[in-house]
Amino acid sequence: AGGADISIATIPVGDREAPEFGILKANEENFITSFIEKPKKEILGEWTSDTGAEMQRQGRHYLASMGIYIFNRSLLDTLLKDEYPSATDFGKEIMPNSIEKYKVISYQYDGYWTDIGNIYSFFEANIALTDDIPAFNLFDSSKTIFTRSRMLPPGKISGTTLEKTVVAEGCLIFASRIETSVLGIRSRIGHGTTVVSCYLMGNDYYETLTQMEANTSKGIPKIGIGERCYIKNAIIDKNCRIGNDVRINGGMHLE
């Protein structure tokens, strides 16, 4: 783009996210002038860029690298074969020095993109699907999301109050209340249970009645969440077994 040797896809981020990314600084023509890998919060003020009025209103003043690069082909050959023949990481080894030697431009992406490289961002990205009109909208027919099709029965829900909840196919839900949560395929939640701000990854299979009885005799809970539980701010892994009368209140205080 713009006669550049290298184009880097960037996305505006805020104060909280910036220390987790490689941050680029761009001039008025969007050419990148400097780069820092995962800057400390104390020096963030030195790394702001003009991200546009809307992004700045949202407090997103920093250009984070998305790890997507477009190279002039001949330059790429030179970089890999001659200048950095033993390099193994574009972001850490090749890009910082290339910014000083070549024309490197920022392509600012303003659509939906999020890094889910840590537990908090992974949790936030999934819970955001429960918003009325989420940034990543699964119901946008012009941007269809395709997944592996499964021949599962429809979900069964009984006696449950649902508020801002996304329910995948094949679920068996008998909980008292579920709010601001995402329930993966084949999720099972027992009577009297409350689930708040949780992501349930679901299950790979259904247990048969025979399997349930055999496991109960050994003191092994059924797959899913049992009865009279209270689960909040949690990520429940696939095929997880949570027995009856369990209370889990997750969050930052557990770190």
Task: Report each predicted region and the residues it spans.
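Left-handed beta-helix
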Residues: 53-55, 74, 81-255
